[in-house]
Amino acid sequence: MLKIKFVGAIEGVSGSCTWLHHTDSDTQFLVDCGMHQGTEREEWANSQAFPFQAARLKYVLLTHAHIDHCGMLPRLVREGFTGLVYATRATRELTELMLLDAARVSGMFTEQEVKQIRWSVLDDDLGFKWGRSIRLAEGVWMAYLRSSHILGACLISIGWKVHDGNRSICFSGDVGCQTDENAYLPLMKSGQHPFPDTDYIVVESTYGSRIRAQEHQDSQLRLARLAEVIAHTLFVKGGKVLMPAFSLHRAQELLMDVLHWMKVSLPAIRQAPEHRGSDRLITANVHAPLGHAVTQVYAKHLCSISPNGKFKYLNAELCESLTMQADEIQAMLQRLVEHGRFNAGEGGYLSMTKPKQPSNFEADIVIASAGMCGNGPVVSYLERWGSNPRNTVILTGYQSAGSKGAELMQRATASPALMDSLSPDLAEVVDMSPYYSAHADQQMLLGFLFRTDGFGCNKPATILINHGNPASKYELRKAVQMRADSRKENDRQIKEVRIADARWINLDSGEVIEQSPIEQALLNELEALRRRL
């Protein structure tokens, strides 16, 4: 029997961790082991005892490098885990960077505990390909498929033998936005889908209740809006542009979009007589200490090639957009990391501030961490530029309640305003975050669940929804049921849609494993205590 218990991301969007136990081989393992983030109540969960014995786990299968999916790995090691963490090479390198940074910032674990993690890197094998089966134990195997969420991200399929054949379950990880039809964000190629004969699909629901506007899924409109805001700030108002950014993935996306502005938009802008001073050299700087190291990983792996000769991760449309070959993009990123400067042509140049170097207030455009504006280099730029209406802050990511970024978001507009309508002692704020979200919306999640890529074998699948707030989960469940009832041609058939909870499930039969009265009473007491705290 293979049984499953959801440990984290049951009530919210962080702390992803799922415990599986194959009883026939007595093999216990996890899919992800993430840190809870957000409110004090949510972060309180990080100090609570694991429901499993870390020393008895043989593996952790890691979907990607975000802290809410990998952040408790060092604690797992501290408590006796000596097994292997499976991941792609890019995910391993990014995870190590994220955990070392978290060790320095949070103090929840040590750098030594991060370095003690034992890795098994899937794509170091010369025979690696997406979807290839890898044995975990007698009668249990897994396969990794590509996600478009961030570099190295994957969905994971786990298969096992039962008395009448085989069963399988797929874990979505975080579902990205890129599809075969519309890979509109700059870096990642489209993600793959669960196998057509999958029996169970565990799917995230971060934006399960949200439908993104078509405008925000259009790369040309995103680039045009960014060009409008930058040109208005630099050449009409005569100010500076500040773009707060998360160090992992968002900073690298913005770097590509700013490079596009320099290479493609700026030459056209210079033909317009109303843009005074547009013939001067423009400088754009990336100032993110962790982002500097992350960019080095992107330089190594973004343009890597699979054994079939195709890009493993790179969105090929980026080459066309920038009029650069993949090796030129790779060389540009490497040059920024090593030498701190890249000539973007006649328009100007990109630069990257190395860790511990001072802020570059001379730059015209600055991409700075942290994304929510509460710490990091962005703080010094806000202090210097935040009181001048000639300057513009472009928000490109989620801002949690109570953060400095959320405060800025309260007065943000969707497009630049006339100078005389702005506050005389505050920088203008423009919200472009809907254009950059790396999470699939409801329609994309439905596509992820129902698409079978034309393959005929299509078992009815049970959907298990987690990693979302209650409203998102219930709205997604309703949408999945409605789509299933419509019986579209070539859609995956759906057997049942459930909201994931903390009870054990026998995946051989699909039945919930009921607790004994004593166990259930103890669980009820713990839940009541947790809610009071």
Predicted region positions:
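Heptad-repeat coiled-coil amphipathic alpha-helices that mediate oligomerization/assembly
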Residues: 519-533
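Conserved phosphate-binding/catalytic loops in two-lobed NTP-binding clefts
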Residues: 485-507
